[in-house]
């Protein structure tokens, strides 16, 4: 069975002496539970695995019950150590306070119980971790599957990855467009919006949240002002509502609005967002063209290609903790600006020969980036770019 790079990280951490709670976070359907189960199977240590996915949010005692179960088994079996794994931990109200209490109790009583928590709501996880568990945890971030992973595991071509994105559960369905679209809609979009966002956050207009996502996904890779979005949506309220919904969609690993790169933070925040899905399947599920037609249509493929490069970048940015922007000044534009500490990287994604790239020269002149290049037509081959270690660019 294919093992992602995170397999070794998680395995190494669980083999170390008990010191930190390990927290695995990432979007739905990217294989968090699968990789953890692979590790548990290969480790010669007893464990208990629980999921809070269908536990009532108010049932805070549930977390303590899980802990008591592993303590009881450890005592009765004379285990030297045990592992407690809780999936979708953020579903339970005040989970972080309960985890802190139980973890500290184990520490005080010298109980060697290692703890691994998984979750798909980044903000709720990080809020709980920073509020109650500071100094007690380590994060392991998992992104969407890369081109290299989809190629090695499923034998995909680059064009397939650009169009179908990187959801491993959808890979066997790409031969049947209807089944593929149904999987993306029900297992990812519906599940994330209904089970993660709407259950976790009071939303005044749930239908508007879904419309915002659908419009944003269809326009992924393009600039679209919030006012223009308001004009396209029914019962849309105001721009601050839309901005809040975009933030929620970003926190769930579905869709974000990239800000314009500027040294002035106020100008950055006031900029028109460039909409970007975290996985290109979320864009192409709304495409009127099937894969074999889209790949031959130069104009459509150019937009799909740019969105595919962007999806790869924002997913990697979450894992490796760098920022992604776009840049535009009058007629000059650069698709993606990456920033980590004081290093800037400018990237132009060129899916067809017609696209202008003068913006890259202008950006070089103004901001002196560490590196700048074209991906695709007339630059680095897309396959080569999608296979490289992005951290070496900085």
Place the predicted regions along the sequence by residue.
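Hydrophobic anchor at the beta1->P-loop junction of P-loop NTPases
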Residues: 24
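Short glycine-rich substrate-engagement loop in P-loop NTPases that contacts/grips substrate
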Residues: 50-79
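N-terminal pre-Walker A segment at the start of P-loop NTPase domains
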Residues: 1-15
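Hydrophobic positions on the alpha1 helix immediately C-terminal to the Walker A/P-loop
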Residues: 35, 39
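Short regulatory helix/loop adjacent to the ATP-binding pocket of P-loop NTPases
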Residues: 123-138, 154-155
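Conserved lysine of the Walker
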Residues: 32
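Accessory nucleic acid-recognition modules appended to NTPase machines
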Residues: 177, 181-341
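Conserved catalytic/switch belt of AAA+ P-loop NTPases
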Residues: 96-117
